[in-house]
Amino acid sequence: MKRTAFAAIAVSTALLCGCADSLPFTEKPAYHEKNCTMNAEISCGELSAQAKVTRRGEGDWEFAFTEPKELMGVVVTLGDEGVTASLGALSVTAEPSAVYNMLPQIIARAVDALPDTPADKISEADGILTLENECADGRIVVTAQKSTGDLITLKCPYQRLAVCFSDIADEICESADTEEVRIIE
């Protein structure tokens, strides 16, 4: 009787655990998979720039440069059509290897790859996640808030690239059917 009761408890515990999305000790933290707008201070060697960055989804990014003054107003868009650069009404397909076009591509690829980061390449200290990835651009290290998934920094030593993110806001849009405003997550 005791064996039957023990077996029933063991089987029901296993079944209940199997219904959960993930086990508590193997759960991957949520990183930056949301659509959002943020400011980015970008430095690459002696070059530096600031941009308002909008992520609309994987592979769909916009970098609106605000500094230096030579780039102010230039918008680099990454999407299905490739890389385009525009200034006002003038829009051109950008040379992907140009430095100010290459940097947004590295940043976008690195952030889009965060959900695929292996668990052994993720560490945490004081609520800050550090994620390390290898890609064609070399080793990339990203830090993010564990609680929100908001990006803090991105570094790619091979390209001498460092990015500091700030003022991260979830992208807000209006519903097409009503005038209600909702946050896209």
Report residues per predicted region.
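Residue-level detector of beta-strand structural context in well-folded domains
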Residues: A40, A51-K52, V74, V83, ...
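Positively charged n-region of N-terminal signal peptides that target proteins for export
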Residues: M1-A5
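An acidic-aromatic
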Residues: V53-A113, Q159-A162
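N-terminal leader/targeting segments and the immediate start of mature chains
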Residues: A10-D60, E70, A94, I168-E185
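A short, compositionally biased
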Residues: C36, L78-E81, D126, K146-T148
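Hydrophobic/aromatic beta-strand elements that line small-molecule binding cavities or substrate pockets
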Residues: Q50-R55, V76, I140-A144, F165
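Flexible, processing/modification-adjacent segments and terminal tails
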Residues: P29-Y31, C36, A40-I42, A85-G138
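Gly/Pro-enriched, hydrophobic low-complexity segments
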Residues: E62-E67, P118-E185
